[in-house]
């Protein structure tokens, strides 16, 4: 793949995609799509893909039961930003799952604590592959692949 240098603005009438290429196989993997509008998930368990979801705002709707959002295999630089698009506090749980226990979260989550115990939410950096939001009423969660194994979360 050639390198290009641009000295002025770059324009796309659709989107920009960043990709990675496996040195051994030549396989191209889409990492982030820039320029597309938000993606609204349905009221069901969801499995994300880099090509469809990375680099785009992901809106989680009001949910009627516990729901799991499963991340794709991590590709360094892929980024998922989630916000809540419902109108009221949920009584169900929303679970973010890395898809494998060997792929864990690193980082912490800032949150509004409704029961005043002021507990900090953070991953231990060696085993937390799931994050569960319980009775949430609003959220903004960012998850980015640190490398091909782990996810940064904030």
State what each model feature region is.
Residues 128-154:
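Low-complexity acidic/polar repeat-biased segments
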């Amino acid at each position: 793949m050639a390198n290009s240098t641009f000295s002025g603005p770059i324009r796309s009438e659709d989107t920009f995609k960043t990709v990675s290429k496996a040195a051994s196989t030549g396989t191209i993997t889409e990492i982030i799509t820039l320029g597309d509008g938000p993606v609204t998930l349905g009221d069901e368990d969801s499995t994300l893909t880099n090509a469809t979801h990375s680099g785009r705002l992901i809106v989680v709707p009001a949910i009627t039961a516990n729901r799991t959002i499963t991340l794709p295999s991590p590709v360094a630089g892929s980024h998922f930003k989630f916000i809540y698009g419902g109108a009221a506090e949920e009584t169900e749980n929303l679970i973010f799952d890395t898809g494998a226990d060997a792929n864990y979260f690193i980082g912490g989550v800032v949150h509004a604590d409704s029961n005043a115990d002021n507990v900090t939410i953070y991953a231990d950096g060696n085993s937390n592959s799931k994050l569960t939001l319980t009775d949430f009423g609003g959220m903004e969660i960012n998850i980015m692949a640190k490398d091909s194994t782990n996810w940064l979360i904030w």
